[in-house]
């Protein structure tokens, strides 16, 4: 599917991939500080530990949401950073961001749009015709 999308739609379309990539990190972050506590502190905190772990996860989620909102202001295409963030087979351009990006460049907007559309189509063609690549790229990020 090829189309122009808004910043909000970019977040919605890429959110499942971001969740896949960030959930392991969120689990590590929420549990890491609890593991570092001395046993006495863990025992004293008792049931509060679980609640504090959940709060840590919520804080991470809030930070991730803010980061995605900022990234949505800067992304030009669905695969801008080289990762297949949108659902398989989805090519997308973000016209508002492209317009902002093109300001001050001494090129016609049509040339910029053609270049970005061709690059996005090339990314999607690569991910479509090399079936294992999408999963391998995402798995590599997850493993890191």
PLM regions: where:
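Cation-handling catalytic/transport regions enriched in His/Asp/Glu
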Residues: 93, 108-114, 132-136, 141
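Auxiliary, metal-adjacent structural segments of Zn-dependent hydrolase domains
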Residues: 1-96
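Short pre-active-site segment immediately N-terminal to the catalytic Zn-binding motif
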Residues: 98-118
């Amino acid at each position: 599917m090829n189309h122009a999308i808004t910043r909000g739609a970019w977040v919605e379309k890429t959110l499942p991939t971001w969740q896949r990539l960030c959930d392991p990190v969120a689990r590590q972050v929420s549990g890491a500080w609890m593991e570092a506590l001395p046993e006495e502190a863990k025992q004293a905190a008792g049931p509060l530990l679980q609640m504090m772990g959940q709060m840590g996860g919520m804080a991470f989620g809030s930070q991730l949401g803010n980061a995605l909102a900022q990234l949505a202001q800067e992304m030009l295409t669905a695969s801008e950073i080289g990762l297949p963030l949108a659902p398989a087979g989805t090519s997308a351009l973000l016209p508002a961001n492209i317009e902002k990006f093109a300001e001050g460049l001494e090129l016609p907007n049509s040339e910029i749009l053609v270049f970005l559309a061709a690059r996005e189509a090339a990314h999607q063609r690569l991910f479509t015709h090399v079936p294992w690549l999408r999963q391998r790229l995402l798995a590599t990020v997850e493993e890191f």
